[in-house]
Amino acid sequence: MTAEATEKRPGIAAAVVVDNGRVLLVRRRVKEGSLSWQLPAGGVEDGETVEQAAVRETKEETGLTVSAVKVLGGRLHPITGRHMSYVVCAAESGTAHLADADELAEVEWSDRNEVAERVPDGFWEPVQAYLDSALSARG
């Protein structure tokens, strides 16, 4: 893929949602590389901020209403080559469920041990550091 083609593809915004000592994970029907369990995420639409995209994608995929708290950062994904932004979000209302059965196979709140099993290589370092802190705060 050319650099020009990569630049024209929309970036991806991922929501990092921790509530009651658990992180919201989704299992995609189609794996991206070795990943099947991941954070709720999707493309940033024209005119949308990464925060808005993370909030929208979480609602579309899981039915959960969240609010953006802060952007942890961004990187070029080593497998997909797409720009990823990671946004900490707070759960506001609703119950997480499988709202997008075409794209997802499962939605789950995972504790730190389950995260280690489902994502054995961990997340990008700033995301993993945030999760380690947020999940250890509850034990």
Annotate each predicted stretch with a short phrase.
Residues 1-9, 132-139:
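Short, low-complexity, intrinsically disordered N-terminal peptides in bacterial proteins
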Residues 2-23, 43, 74:
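Conserved N-terminal beta-strand and adjoining loop/helix that marks the start
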Residues 11, 35, 83-87:
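Short beta-strand micro-motifs in enzyme catalytic cores
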Residues 19-60:
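Conserved Nudix-box catalytic region and its N-terminal flanking loop in Nudix hydrolases
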Residues 64-73:
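A short coil-to-beta-strand element that immediately follows conserved catalytic motifs
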Residues 75-97, 108, 129-134:
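Active-site-adjacent beta-strand/loop module that shapes the phosphate/pyrophosphate-binding cleft
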Residues 98-131:
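NUDIX/MutT-family hydrolases
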